[in-house]
Curated annotation (Swiss-Prot):
GO terms for molecular function: metal ion binding; ubiquinol-cytochrome-c reductase activity. It holds the Pfam family Cytochrome_B. Its cofactor is heme b. Binds 2 heme b groups non-covalently. The cytochrome bc1 complex contains 11 subunits: 3 respiratory subunits (MT-CYB, CYC1 and UQCRFS1), 2 core proteins (UQCRC1 and UQCRC2) and 6 low-molecular weight proteins (UQCRH/QCR6, UQCRB/QCR7, UQCRQ/QCR8, UQCR10/QCR9, UQCR11/QCR10 and a cleavage product of UQCRFS1). This cytochrome bc1 complex then forms a dimer. Gene3D superfamilies: Cytochrome Bc1 Complex, Chain C. It is found in: Mitochondrion inner membrane. It comes from Phascogale tapoatafa. This is Cytochrome b.
């Protein structure tokens, strides 16, 4: 009998991607985050689709439509809580996935890595426009502050900002177009994720040792399907615990007040997953300089493959690079904390030092550590 999964044009693609795919035998739990991101994306698209059925993208009714979803729509409160906290889980998985790529040298698959960085930027854009939709105080002022950064661009800045707003300030036109963006971008993310996988399957997965694993591969199914299923159960458990027991713990209390252009909140800040970049933006007193630093904090990921100096791919056997990696992790946690603090001492100087350390680690110290480790591994006799 002909095996359908190996001959059918559609089933064949799925088979080569998720069933008979040769995978390294030693990939650890860090490799689960790719599939977890896929699950997060599906959860977000499904919950978002049902929320969009009841939401109205008009400044007069947006806030009340969200309240209506939570109060009157059957399980609307659950949909909203899953969608809002699903975004937090999405970013948690994203940051860990990027961390894995840096630690184990997966960035040397340049096409996969570059598409991944574009994916990260697209997800960040989607989350930003999505945060504006409930039209609470923090939604409105967050949109005002971040879109205003465009006006720092020389010559065309103000025109560009007004073009994005659809007027002279964040208003009805802005909310309507942000809803349109928030609806279309997840489908672009799906397309990019498919391209990301396409490039990954050209080379095959990396593994913790960083050594070519071709001599020892195992089929993806059942070994890694069961492993991914365990990861999925744990992800859903954490998401449900968050959404059911503490749904507002990661949000901002100001967003329970309807947007009011005449009343500025005492401390404008984005969601927790943007705080590290927000801290870098605020650490530079100049507006244009801050915007450039903000962009550089993410786009620096694109040049990481060019800064790889070590003879070994992975950091598994490179203790100096490992130490710097964990300092970088601590630095990003510090920046996240600073981003949520008011602009006053000692937070200003801590933010500036942490921002400097972030760029110093990636651009100077980690490449130097790679060269030092190469030197230490050379025979000295």
């Amino acid at each position: 009998m002909i095996n359908l999964r190996k001959t059918h044009p559609l089933m064949k693609i799925i088979n080569h991607s998720f069933i008979d795919l040769p995978a390294p035998s030693n990939i650890s739990a860090w490799w689960n985050f790719g599939s977890l991101l896929g699950i997060c994306l599906m959860i977000q698209i499904l919950t978002g689709f049902f929320l969009a059925m009841h939401y109205t993208s008009d400044t007069l009714t947006a806030f009340t439509s969200v309240a209506h979803i939570c109060r009157d729509v059957n399980y609307g409160w659950l949909l909203r809580n899953l969608h809002a906290n699903g975004a937090s889980m999405f970013f948690m998985c994203l940051f860990l996935h990027v961390g894995l790529g840096i630690y184990y040298g997966s960035y040397l698959y340049k096409e996969t890595w570059n598409i991944g960085v574009i994916l990260l930027l697209t997800v960040m854009a989607t989350a930003f426009v999505g945060y504006v939709l409930p039209w609470g105080q923090m939604s409105f002022w967050g949109a005002t502050v971040i879109t205003n950064l465009l006006s720092a661009i020389p010559y065309i800045g103000t025109t560009l900002a007004e073009w994005i707003w659809g007027g002279f300030a964040v208003d009805k036109a802005t909310l309507t177009r942000f809803f349109a963006f928030h609806f279309i971008l997840p489908f672009i993310i799906v397309a990019l994720a498919i391209v990301h996988l396409l490039f990954l399957h050209e080379t095959g997965s990396n593994n913790p040792s960083g050594i070519n694993p071709d001599s020892d591969k195992i089929p993806f199914h059942p070994y890694y399907t069961i492993k991914d299923a365990l990861g999925a159960v744990l992800l859903l458990l954490v998401l449900l615990l968050l959404a059911l027991f503490s749904p507002d713990s990661l949000g901002d209390p100001d967003n329970f007040s309807p947007a009011n252009p005449l009343n500025t909140p005492p401390h404008i800040k984005p969601e927790w997953y943007f705080l590290f970049a927000y801290a870098i933006l605020r650490s530079i007193p100049n507006k244009l300089g801050g915007v450039l630093a903000l962009l550089a904090s993410i786009l620096i990921l694109l040049i990481i493959p060019l800064l790889h100096t070590a003879n070994q791919r992975s950091m598994m056997f490179r203790p100096v690079s490992q130490t710097l990696f964990w300092i970088l992790t601590a630095d990003l946690i510090t920046l996240t904390w600073i981003g949520g603090q008011p602009v006053e001492q000692p937070f200003i100087i801590i933010g500036q030092l942490a921002s400097m350390l972030y760029f110093l680690l990636i651009l100077v110290l980690m490449p130097l550590a790679g060269m030092f480790e190469n030197y230490m591994l050379k025979p000295k006799w």
